[in-house]
UniProtKB/Swiss-Prot annotation:
The keyword Transmembrane helix does not apply. This is Isomerase trt14. It is an enzyme of class 5 (isomerase). Changing S37V: Does not significantly affect the catalytic activity. Changing Y19F: Alters the stereochemistry and the specificity of the enzyme reaction. Pathway: Secondary metabolite biosynthesis; terpenoid biosynthesis. Its EC number is 5.-.-.-. Substrate binds at Y19, R39, R48. Isomerase; part of the gene cluster that mediates the biosynthesis of terretonin, a fungal meroterpenoid that acts as a mycotoxin. The first step of the pathway is the synthesis of 3,5-dimethylorsellinic acid (DMOA) by the polyketide synthase trt4. DMOA is then prenylated into farnesyl-DMOA by the polyprenyl transferase trt2. Methylation by the methyltransferase trt5 then leads to farnesyl-DMOA methyl ester which is further subject to epoxidation by the FAD-dependent monooxygenase trt8 to yield epoxyfarnesyl-DMOA methyl ester. GO terms for molecular function: isomerase activity. Disruption phenotype: Impairs the synthesis of terretonin but accumulates terretonin C.
Length: 142
């Protein structure tokens, strides 16, 4: 039986909950072993496998003291049951070594055939905010 809308949304929300734990292990705990994530930047496209995602999280922890993402409005959630995709419009908040982080992003999830794990992620970020944030990090050595 194909996963229902509710199944797909529940898996995407579980991913967000694990993402908010913000550890290399938690961010992959709801992903398939061969899953990939794609960052959607016009100038910074990146595709990461599980190991690369864990490394990116470990590196981000050097900058972020805390990070939380949350669905802005459940009414804006888009679900395509046929392709097993869920789209969330998210707010992200955090404390960093250079001050507050506050932005919005969009995550597109494609689930495994049973709907219980995330197989692919496309993450779109506010590039203007990212550029400004990265300029605050200029000159800082980790």
């Amino acid at each position: 039986m194909s996963p229902t809308r509710e199944d797909l949304v529940a898996t995407a929300k579980l991913f967000i909950a694990k993402y908010n734990e913000f550890t290399p292990e938690s961010i992959i705990s709801v992903r398939t072993p061969n899953s990939v994530s794609h960052r959607l930047f016009p100038t910074r496209n990146a595709t990461r496998n599980i190991g690369e995602s864990m490394e990116a999280c470990a590196n981000a922890k050097e900058v972020f003291k805390s990070l939380t993402v949350s669905v802005i409005d459940d009414n804006d959630t888009i679900v395509d049951e046929r392709t097993r995709k869920v789209v969330f419009y998210l707010a992200s908040r955090g404390d960093t070594i250079v001050g507050e982080w506050k932005s919005e992003c969009i995550f597109i999830f494609q689930m495994s055939e049973d709907g219980k794990l995330v197989d692919r992620i496309w993450a779109g970020f506010d590039t203007a905010y990212m550029d400004e944030f990265e300029s605050r990090l200029d000159g800082i050595t980790f």
